[in-house]
A protein has these predicted regions:
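Long, low-complexity, acidic Ser/Pro- and Gly-enriched intrinsically disordered regions
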Residues: 1-95, 102, 107-378
Length: 378
């Protein structure tokens, strides 16, 4: 306190604020540092160093400068807290900046351990800072079951790219686990390690692997991961997902769980879907999912089957067909579940908004028509 008084006597307010800033920074007292940084910003702008609710309203220029200065203060305090391992507190300051990639870089520098694991996962997944990294921590430290729950309750509500990242991790993890389990059983039974690499190769001509009570991985996990895999884009991971269906379809009937349309018969229908995305059996897959879509009453059964069909057409580079299917099968005002691109997104993909304009005119959708008109002439 005496040193502060001496600092104030020697240099006034500015000297005191500088000294306090250095002190709190050296002591890693970042909440207090933030308060000092706020005072410095306000003093620089000629404002009282402590906010007064009765103060006059600021003009736009000063208000913008104040906001910029406060954001810089948030950045310094939040970065310090993160580097000190105080993850939730650091994120509290860094959230207003909107710089998620910068925060992700900082978070990845923090070694994960028992003391901070839950905080890391919360900020990365729940707060959306780095969902892929956070999900990898869940998978590594809490296992498959908890990862599936996290995917269902949190990841599935995030943007498609984040879903893909997490789904790829789960597919790779489960495929590796199942492959190892199968190889161990085969080696024990046959007296030597199998030469086959893929799951399909391991299970073909080995019917003895599949008895009434026999399985080599949690079958509920398998069904869930195959379902999640439908968002996957990369060829290598799609092939792993297809490989998982080769095992699943050979399981005893009691482990063949009923799925939701259009994947009621989970493994055969999923296999057909993955094959189409890999450029195989495209016509057969499109025919199958078209029949499922056409058999659906959107008002009473929901739109999932229709959306899966539209999305499959799009992913198989049949976007014009997807546009026509969307127009024909999803009447105006239909509530969708977000599995397929919208008519606007499909039109933008092909660079042609003519059909969208026609439909919007017919349905007296003024906003949709105007949007398509402006995009067409942009």
């Amino acid at each position: 306190m005496d040193r502060l008084a001496e600092s104030f006597a020697a240099g006034g307010i500015d000297s005191t604020l500088d000294a306090l800033g250095q002190y709190f920074k050296s002591e890693k007292k970042y909440h207090e540092l933030f308060e000092i940084l706020k005072m410095k910003v306000r003093r620089k702008l000629g404002l009282p160093i402590v906010y007064d609710e009765n103060a006059i309203e600021l003009d736009e220029k000063v208000r913008n400068q104040l906001e910029d200065g406060l954001l810089e203060a948030c950045k310094e305090a939040g970065t310090g807290l993160l580097r000190d391992g105080k993850i939730r507190e650091g994120w509290m300051y860094l959230r207003p900046l909107g710089d998620r990639s910068g925060v992700e870089s900082l978070v990845r520098e923090i070694p994960a351990d028992e003391s901070n694991l839950d905080e890391l996962i919360e900020v990365c997944v729940s707060e959306g800072v780095a969902p892929g990294y956070g999900f990898s921590l869940v998978l590594e430290h809490y296992g498959t079951c908890n990862s599936i729950t996290a995917y269902e309750t949190q990841i599935s509500h995030l943007p498609r790219a984040d879903q893909e990242n997490a789904a790829e991790q789960l597919v790779s993890h489960l495929h590796a686990e199942l492959s190892k389990n199968l190889k161990d059983v085969i080696s024990q039974q046959e007296g030597q390690a199998p030469s086959e690499i893929s799951i399909k190769g391991l299970v073909e001509d080995r019917d003895w692997l599949f008895g009434e009570l026999t399985y080599h991985i949690d079958t509920t996990h398998l069904a869930s991961v195959v379902r999640f895999a439908r968002v996957v884009q990369t060829e290598s991971c799609l092939r792993l997902a297809l490989d998982l269906t080769e095992y699943g379809r050979r399981l005893h009937s009691q482990f063949q769980y009923q799925g939701e349309e259009p994947f009621a018969d989970v493994y055969p229908s999923s296999a057909l879907y993955f094959q189409a995305l890999l450029g195989e059996n495209i016509d057969a897959a499109i025919h199958y999912f078209k029949e499922k879509a056409e058999a659906t009453d959107a008002y009473h059964q929901g739109t999932a089957s229709i959306e899966v069909y539209i999305d499959l057409l799009t992913r198989c580079d049949r976007t014009q067909e997807a546009i026509e299917a969307s127009i024909a099968m999803l009447p105006a005002g239909t509530r969708t579940v977000g599995l397929a691109p919208t008519l606007y997104e499909l039109s933008r993909r092909v660079g042609d908004f003519s059909r969208m304009m026609e439909v919007c005119r017919k349905n007296e959708d003024v906003l949709g028509f105007a949007t398509a008109l402006m995009q067409k002439n942009a």
